[in-house]
Amino acid sequence: MIFLAPFEFLDPLRHALPLTCTGLIIIFAFYLSRHHSPKPAPNIPIHSYDREEYFRRGYELVQEGQKKHPSCFQLRTATGWKILVPIRFVEELRKNPSLSFARGNDKDAFIEYPGFEAMEAACHDDYFMQEVVRVKLTQTLNLLYSSVIDESAVAMSEVLGEDKIWRTLRIKDDINHIVARVTSRVFLGFPLCRNQKWLDIVVNHTKAVFMAQKRMRQTPPALRPLIHYFLPETKLLRQHLHAARTLISPELAKRRAAVEEALRHGKIPKESANAISWMVEVSQAQGRKIDVAVHVVSLSMTAIQTTSEVMTNCILQLCETPSIVDDLRAEIIFLLKEGGWTKYTLYKMRLLDSFIREVMRHHDFLRVTSWRGCTEDVVLSDGTVLPKGSCIYFDDSKVVDPEHYPDPEKFDPMRSFKKREQPGQEDRHQFVSLQTDHMAFGYGIHACPGRFFANMELKVMLCNFLLKYDVRLVPGEKRPVDILFEVQRMVPPDVRVQIKVRDQEPEVDLYSPISST
């Protein structure tokens, strides 16, 4: 229009302004990152100043630092400086009130950003989730065998198939789905445990969190409060949680209606053995409000991620050491026929337990353990000061220490089995044991309370798998090298194996094992 003509000279500026502002923001962010980044702790050796190097090869940096430094040392990471503390100090620190679980994990989990609420739920120091698992889930385990047995059998049949000829599968994806089904059967029951929308959420949210955290680490700290709104990975997290709330809300409404109906008739409301009820009951007892859907996603994500990784590693190890398969099957068949599905039966499966524990040692998921934040200065027995505000974690070097594990590079499925045969050692060296030479589940007051459920779930699934299927690597292929990211080690997502139903019928009925004698 003619009356705009005098201002046409401003048109190029109108287009250039957003680019100019974006450029200035980026420059300012890099300035802040360079000049206002967290400072390392004084008087503790620095092994690496390069946070990009930690991003690429943190696993190796930890190993190198352990060999070079006799005590603590520091590594610069994308979320600040980390102090690696030798495992010999874990006993003196395990009950120290100045070490916070939440403060040790909040920065790495990015809990202040929308979309990461499930991580925030897992990182609190208030013991809510620990109470749900320790009091509600663990004390209900004896009532859950039938659900875990049934869902693992049905899920394996549907996912792994019933073919008696070799089929090639991407086993990690399939195991993720099976574990999600079994875990959801326990946490939520029917119909959600077989609802594909729910299964997609709990399986994919773990992957999405990993990818979102990776992108956030690659983003300069000063830009994160802005950039996270636009990253596809963080958008996906928010979508997952919205979908989870949509699915969980009707279940909450049903529970609320059942409670109101019971009270209206003067009855005590019936307790339900599922995560929704557990969380409502614990939150009411603690006088706090929670987002139930977020906490259910958090609990599911934690359980599925670890169990899937261990289960996948177990199957791959069966391919690499097939000589152990017949002995494992013989133990499972004998004990199930003798005592059926009980806690004591699982306890007596010493060879299976030893096999799983050795898999976790040989294919450790993390090179470090027990992230903690110092809320006050902490002084170690050798005089090292861990300053207030610093983040520490312990090395897990004993799993490869010849003094604790002779010939540590060798996979020995009998390793813990032999140790438990020694007098006075029968109850030690178990998969669920908390020991300084086996810290897969942490140590001290924040040790994983869900390890007993993981133990039961893993053993039931492995019993089912071993009695029904044969497995091998794809002919001509080797086990692929694990993926290393920071201090984590993971099975590659595209790993393949071949599976077929065994030529003979299972020697024991998993639903009624004693009647099979």
Curated annotation (Swiss-Prot):
User: Per UniProt, which keywords does this protein have?
Assistant: Glycoprotein, Heme, Iron, Membrane, Metal-binding, Monooxygenase, Oxidoreductase, Transmembrane, Transmembrane helix
Annotated Gene Ontology cellular component terms: membrane
Supply the SUPFAM superfamilies for this chain.
Answer: Cytochrome P450 (SSF48264)
InterPro entries for this protein: Cyt_P450, Cyt_P450_CS, Cyt_P450_E_grp-IV, Cyt_P450_sf
Pfam families from the UniProt entry: p450
Q: Where are the transmembrane segments?
A: 16-33
Q: How does it sit in the membrane?
A: Single-pass membrane protein
User: PROSITE patterns recorded for this chain?
Assistant: CYTOCHROME_P450
Give the highest taxon in the source lineage. Eukaryota
* Compartments (UniProt record): Membrane
Molecular function, one GO term: oxidoreductase activity, acting on paired donors, with incorporation or reduction of molecular oxygen
Q: Which cofactor does it need?
A: heme
Q: Chief localization class? A: membrane
Positions bearing carbohydrate? N204
Q: Name one GO biological process term.
A: secondary metabolic process
What positions does the entry give for heme binding?
C448
Q: Which EC numbers characterise this protein's activity in its record?
A: 1.-.-.-
Q: In which pathway does it act?
A: Mycotoxin biosynthesis
Q: Which family does it belong to?
A: Belongs to the cytochrome P450 family.
Q: What does this protein do?
A: Cytochrome P450 monooxygenase; part of the gene cluster that mediates the biosynthesis of the diterpene glucoside brassicicene C. In the first step of the brassicicene C biosynthesis, the bifunctional diterpene synthase bsc8 that possesses both prenyl transferase and terpene cyclase activity, converts isopentenyl diphosphate and dimethylallyl diphosphate into geranylgeranyl diphosphate (GGDP) that is further converted into fusicocca-2,10(14)-diene, the first precursor for brassicicene C.
What protein name does the entry list? Cytochrome P450 monooxygenase bsc11
Organism source for this protein? Alternaria brassicicola (Dark leaf spot agent)
